[in-house]
Amino acid sequence: MKKVLGLVVAAAMGLSSAAFAAETATTPAPTATTTKAAPAKTTHHKKQHKAAPAQKAQAAKKHHKNTKAEQKAPEQKAQAAKKHAGKHSHQQPAKPAAQPAA
């Protein structure tokens, strides 16, 4: 009678009646000799500590520029000379236009 009541309650609660019946009917068997596995040997990895860098100003930390002291500044040119740098060598001197006889 208790099993039937248990099944009804289990069905009302939304549990599987077969699982509930199997759970209540059988008692858990005592486990036989359980042996614990030996814990795995753990290896500890040591971190390599880097040497502390020299202290810098905030602006120096943010702006990493490759500056060379020996590098000289390029010659200043007019804008037209910069744009047409390669075209000057191929031009030939202009010939005077032939004037028709009057």
From Swiss-Prot:
A cellular-component GO term for this protein: periplasmic space
Compositional bias segments (type: Low complexity): 22-41, 91-102
Keywords for this protein: Periplasm, Signal
Keyword set includes Amino-acid biosynthesis: no
Entries under Pfam families matching the protein: Asr
Transmembrane segments: none
Post-translational modification: Proteolytic processing gives rise to the active protein.
Chief localization: periplasm
Annotated region (Disordered), positions in chain: 22-102
This protein's record includes keyword Transferase: no
Prodomain positions: 22-58
Compositionally biased spans, kind Basic residues: 80-90
InterPro entries in alphabetical order: Acid_shock
Subcellular location: Periplasm
Signal peptide: 1-21
Classification via NCBIfam families: acid_shock_Asr (NF033636)
Family: Belongs to the Asr family.
Function: Required for growth and/or survival at acidic conditions.
Name of protein: Acid shock protein
Natural source organism: Escherichia coli (strain SE11)
